[in-house]
């Protein structure tokens, strides 16, 4: 699906190595390309590399050897990060996990001590057992936009794997701050990205429920993912229109319900529990000293100030737009959005 001269270079490589199989299709995004590769793959393991990064020439052979040695369902290596402009390695961002093997991983350990809860969100540093992906019909969701497909695939695939392996070797080189890269373009927070994040979370929750995996770890993960939209140095919620704010809050309510937030609320860390409570119980702007105190607290530095700033914004929205509270059945979106999980 490339629109440049990539195909010409691939033909030259195929002339040098007959094992290379070329696939050509209309450019439909990275997920469609990966799915085409998965459908055509016939090997024991499969891997996915981003087009503007590079890797150690022995990366896949070393991952493959390690996977065979441990009979692993998924094996992951470490990675370097380098600057796009200078090729300088950024040591602070280097990821080198300790060698570890777990032969009985379980989604019940999500975000606790299990190895799979600590795995990197990206797919490019891993090999996946092909038969495992096929057995569970796992493919990338073509309805999700750039930046969401890797993490979504990981959260669908890894819980199916029971034998997980880390090797400490840094064999992948991830390009940072690349002007034309997909990851750079998707890092800018927007209302559409907020909606997309909720859509992704609802999709994952639905998938986990069907597998019988639902637990507090997934709910905590969701709260942590949406936190920057509400509580950060420059929260997107403050920049939304009133209709967009109401849409975001309605989506939160839907996620809270589907992820069984009431059941798992007590398991959240302190600030995440505060945010969940805040989003669930917004009240109108208080009168008198209460109004003054809320305004003053919103100016405090750090996390506390951001929390009160969000509380103040929610109170103002509640007073002006939704005096009767946020009700899903009365929700309206500034742009069409289907809250049902997209199909594979």
Walk through the language-model features, giving the residues of each.
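Donor-binding/catalytic cores of nucleotide-activated saccharide
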Residues: 30, 51-168, 172-191
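A conserved acidic beta->alpha catalytic loop
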Residues: 1-8, 50
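Short aromatic/hydrophobic "clamp" motif used to bind/position activated sugar donors
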Residues: 46
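Glycine-rich, basic loop-to-helix element that forms the pyrophosphate-binding segment
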Residues: 25-41
């Amino acid at each position: 699906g490339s629109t440049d001269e990539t195909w010409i270079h691939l033909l030259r490589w195929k002339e040098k190595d007959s094992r290379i199989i070329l696939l050509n299709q209309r450019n439909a995004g990275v997920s469609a390309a990966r799915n085409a590769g998965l459908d055509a793959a016939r090997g024991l393991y499969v891997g996915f590399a981003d087009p503007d990064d590079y890797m150690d020439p022995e990366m896949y052979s070393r991952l493959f050897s390690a996977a065979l040695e441990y009979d692993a369902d998924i094996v992951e290596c470490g990675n370097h990060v380098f600057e796009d402009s200078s090729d300088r390695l950024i040591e602070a961002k280097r990821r080198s996990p300790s060698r570890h093997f777990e032969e009985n991983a379980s989604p019940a350990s999500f975000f606790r001590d299990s190895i799979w809860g600590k795995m990197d969100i990206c797919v490019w540093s891993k090999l996946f057992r092909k038969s495992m992906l096929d057995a569970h019909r796992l493919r990338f969701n073509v309805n999700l936009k750039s930046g969401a497909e890797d993490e979504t695939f990981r959260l669908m695939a890894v819980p199916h794997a029971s034998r997980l392996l880390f090797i400490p070797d840094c064999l992948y080189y991830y390009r940072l701050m690349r002007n034309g890269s997909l990851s750079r373009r998707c890092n800018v927070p927007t209302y559409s990205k907020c909606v997309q994040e909720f859509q992704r979370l609802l999709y994952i929750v639905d998938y986990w429920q069907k597998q019988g995996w639902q637990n507090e770890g997934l709910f905590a993960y969701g709260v942590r993912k949406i936190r920057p939209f509400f509580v950060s140095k420059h929260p997107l919620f403050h920049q939304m229109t009133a209709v967009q704010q109401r849409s975001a809050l309605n989506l939160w309510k839907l996620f809270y319900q589907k992820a069984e937030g009431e059941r798992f609320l007590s398991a959240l860390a302190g600030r995440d529990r505060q945010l969940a409570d805040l989003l669930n119980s917004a009240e109108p702007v208080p009168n008198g000293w209460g109004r003054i105190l809320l305004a003053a607290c919103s100016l405090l530095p750090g996390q506390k100030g951001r929390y009160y700033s969000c509380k103040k914004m929610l109170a103002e929205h509640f007073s002006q737009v939704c005096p009767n509270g946020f009700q899903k059945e009365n929700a309206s979106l500034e742009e069409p959005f289907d809250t049902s999980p997209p199909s594979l």
